[in-house]
Amino acid sequence: MKHLYALSFLMWLITLGSASAQTGRITGTVVTNDHQPAEFVNVYLKGTTQGASTDAEGTFELQDIQAGSYTLVASSVGLKSVSQPVEVRANQTTTVSFTLEVDGKELEEIVVRANPSLYVTDYPSISLRLKTPLLETPQNIQVISNQVLKDQQIFDMQEGVIRNVSGATRSEHWETYARIVMRGSRVASFRNGMNVTETWGPLTEDMSMVERIEFVKGPAGFMLASGEPSGFYNVVTKKPTGFTKAEASMTVGSFGTYRSTLDFDGKLSKDGKVLYRLNLMGQLKGTHRAYEYNNRVSVVPVLKFQINPRTSLTAEYTYQYVQMSPIGSSYSYSPNGLGDLPVNFSTLEPNMRPTTVNDQSLTLTFSHSLNDDWKFTSQLAYLNFDQVGQSLWPSSFVGDTLLRAASIWDILGVTKVGQFFVNGDVRTGALTHRILAGLDMGDKDYYHDWAQGGAITGASSFNVFNPVYGQVPASAYPVYDRSLDIRERGVRYNNQYAALYLQDEIRMLDEKLRLTLAGRYTTTGDADPYSGQVDAEKFTPRVGLSYSLTPSMSVYGVYDQAFIPQAGASFEGTPFDPIVGDNKEVGLKTDWLNGRWTASLAAYQITKNNVLTSDPEHQYFSIQLGQTKTQGLEIDLRGELVEGLNVTMNYAYTDGKVTKDTDGSFQGTQIPGTDKHIANAWLHYKFWQGAFEGLGLSFGVQHSSGRTAWYGAYDRTVDPSMPDYTRFDAAVSYQFGKMGVSLNANNLFNAQLLSGAYYPYSNFYYWQAEALRNYRLSMNYRF
């Protein structure tokens, strides 16, 4: 642990004489009359275009305000507006506090109008630890709001979430988890700021419990201990708001889809010190493939104890149950090529035993404001993923006949996470130091058993071009022995990590210029029966610079690192060094029309060194000569362009290539599983007055080209490219009073949409085909 002392060299003093300027800033908090933080409150200077909205802690910040006297106004739907005079002095910060009273009549009668909070968010969630507005953060962070998820009728992470962020694609389409690729590699999965990534997990969060989803592009030392340099996505679950309200919804759709949700939000004590949130969901869902289904139940209660105005404790329990068809059922197989079978082709039989998942987690979050400038937060979490089931895969092809095999697929994943961090501001003359310091710890145990199984015996031949179902007797399937606990019969993978992080965001020149100096020291330990124990440690620096050209436009640059421990050793017995990923990024961010819509442009280059490649002199061994380089351009736009028209639009160009290998034969090859061009758009227009008041119309398109399959990329006898992908969707909705109805149509033009590859080990193709045109009709009621 002597390397911990390396952190003492991370920060250094900066002496900079800043020119005198006649501007100051205003910061403050907004709470309700029962002392709860008020989120999404609009705070603005009357008679000007300068304003902001509060974050989840009720805090706000206005910068670059000309010195003088103003009237500061705070307003929000369901709260009585309040104003107060404020004096802004040059080179000083004015602190203001508001207490707003609930307007019961407005909450009861008002129909919430589209506003900048519906598609646009000013601040990251508390779980990302950053107090800095997104506009000023030197990193590409995109936030998908709950309203977007509702408009698109998304049920879980599998269903089109990635269309709302530039450059994201899915590499696998299993029903249990979302494997998302961005900037050339898989991104990590976070929930409420905690890394919950597993080899085949986590279970996808149902959107009924989700408040927002944050995509953080590139390495993020303030969150990631170790992992791919592509970034991560953070699912933020719903928390109590302090308002008493509820919402119910029912959905019916194609393929026998039936779904209901309930969302209750309110107070358990009259003084408002004990709050609750309860989300319930039940779902029966088939697919376009015969005998395939995914039925789910989720129960998510949250309790928040406001111990005093500065201290709170939040307890959240999540339970998700899934009963589904065997894993692997979503794939099609052919000896001839991709896509030469009908989209509804299935290898399933109607009498196959289901796979079940019980997913539970418990999270405790303690928050204490030491004073107006400093805050301490800690999180403890326990997650348990228990899967009992089987998988269905091809054994081989004999002509056009597919020989199918079933095997046990039991999993137990137990994750324990602890996080402790402190945020605060220190002012030294003309400089403000925004400090973030934290400790992350985690222990992940993962057991799997797929060692039992075999061919489906006694079955009649299964011709993929003329399949006949229902001919397999129950006795033909393998019988699995589960008499031993999976901890005894399964293969164990264990990952442990601990990391210290320290960051100083130095704000100068009236806080127009912001320099971030940070570093993380991480130790990891990985163990499995194949590679034994692999320990690694690494110090990763982070340097960022952001400058506000105007109050609504900033430019930034950032350098950050990530590392990935590697098991094994060379022929000489030398252990492999971790993969190191370096990210260099520059960008531009803008807010328009007082934050009603935002746009960002980012250019980056990620270089991964120490990648393993084959040893030319020793067969079956590897050496560390490999390198990949991914560079690209990302554009994101979201918000209300004109009154009533909310959009989410993005484009990404990704150029990922192998730049070094053993003999150079694969240099210049596109990184498997990447798409060169991805473009998405979603437009939602709502009429707010006139004969069509309450009517909403939506239209969306997803397109990607230059696609490369995961397998076969290094087999020169096979073309690894996949066909272009273009899908059109549309929706119509109507809101009348407290009730709303929405009809969504997906894949309007019945496009054949595929993702798959050639499997070189068995000489056949596998792919997944999306459904042709399908519908969802949803009704919701607020009370």
Where are these regions (language model features)?
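Membrane-embedded beta-barrel scaffold of Gram-negative outer-membrane proteins
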Residues: 367-381, 385-391, 580-643, 647-659
